[in-house]
Amino acid sequence: ESYMAATVALSGGGGWPMTVFLTPEQKPLCAGTYFPPEDGHGRPGFGTLIERIAELWENERDDLFAQAEQLTEQVKKQSKLGRACGIGAESIAAAVDQLESAFDPRWGGFGAAPKFPPSAALELLLRHHHRSGEARALEMVTKTLDGMKNGGLYDHLAGGFARYSTDERWLAPHFEKMLYDNALLARVYTWASQVTNRDEYSRVARETLDYVLREMQSAEGGYYSATDADSEGEEGKFFVWTPEQIRQVLTEAEARAFSAAYDVTPGGNWEGHSILNTPRPLAEVASELETSEADLRERLASAKSKLLAARLKRVPPLLDDKVV
């Protein structure tokens, strides 16, 4: 628990895997969650990180020890404060203030990349808004929910969310899907739809639960814990598209509409391929295509159904069949 608290303090978020570098006295020097094998998407690879820490250990060891000591004391103080104070209105207000200080006003979420879906924080903010009427709390919720559902973190064909985003704008996910994330996010989007009366939130909640029931439920009625990020040895291969792949499945009109709405381009937005996302309002896309929103929605619904059927013919990611 102490190392996870240190990870949250240093990186703005926690999760598994957890990566912590320690002093010989087992005090944390550096902490984070997943680091890729190689540098990419604005993030250092694990090898780069090790080399940097080794360099600091050789040249700035005293500063590292001081940082480790300071962080250890901070974690101890927070632990004691939590046990002594319990949770009351003052604690909740302090938590909301802390979330606001870490909030990303452009893309939503809290802290820097990698960004994990902050389900518990969003539930806290929704409850706080319900009790206090504080508009800022709801603004943080809606900005974050919009960013996640519009980005590549969300599976726009099958529903459900990936485990986290490797970038600040929720575009490039680590494509693994976890049962617990999707259960929590379905609840948050449901509550948000009740508070805001926004149909798109209830749609995302339904699609997420449909995904869980369709792809993660065992024959005996339990639920599998996760699906992998990789298929055929490549991360994300099951999920990404090229314009040519789109045209092979759809009519010309459907392909044009879908590519415009879901950001499918010749150059791609991720390693030469396109991660599906919706960066523009549907009304803007409809205007560009000189059609009505109703007609565009009809084309997109047909296109998504065809593309999902085509995707199901690909080699799927491995299923972690531990049952919850």
Residue ranges with predicted function:
Residues E1-V324:
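Replace the tail clause
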